[in-house]
């Protein structure tokens, strides 16, 4: 079984989270024409974000933070030893239930940051028509880097 819990407070830890993203995504290095040519193989879908970095699978550690000014019951989340945020208060009970599972495996996945996406110049064109690179633009943007805790048993 698997349970996922998003890390909260990630906006305050963007620099730390970015430092965990180290593996470049091959598809991010490709040009519009190259992305378009591999789309036919089903590797890349138009309108799907192609992040610069692969998802980083990190070790997870959770630690009580009794001196937290906002919540003395706060639980810090660490990815590969780096403090990246907190367990949402609403998930404390879920986390307690998960912690009781035998053979519990846990990790934290870090994702997001710079991306590019192939977008139609005129959205809503007939999808049955042939794909044509000139009908698309390659737009770059950036999402906040986020983290999600993954528990499996």
What are these regions (language model features)?
Residues 1-153:
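Conserved active-site motif detector
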């Amino acid at each position: 079984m698997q349970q996922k819990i998003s890390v909260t407070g990630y906006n305050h830890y963007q620099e730390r989270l970015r430092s965990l993203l180290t593996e470049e995504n091959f598809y991010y290095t490709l040009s519009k024409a190259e992305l378009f040519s591999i789309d036919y193989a089903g590797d890349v879908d138009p309108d799907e974000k192609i992040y610069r970095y692969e998802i980083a699978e990190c070790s997870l550690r959770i630690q009580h933070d009794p001196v937290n000014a906002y919540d003395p019951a706060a639980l810090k989340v660490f990815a590969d030893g780096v403090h990246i945020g907190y367990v949402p208060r609403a998930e404390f009970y879920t986390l307690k239930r998960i912690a009781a599972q035998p053979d519990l495996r846990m990790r934290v996945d870090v994702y997001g940051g710079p991306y590019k996406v192939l977008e139609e110049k005129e959205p809503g064109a007939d999808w049955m028509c042939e794909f044509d690179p000139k009908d698309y633009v390659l737009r770059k943007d950036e999402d906040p880097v986020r983290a999600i805790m993954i528990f499996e048993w």
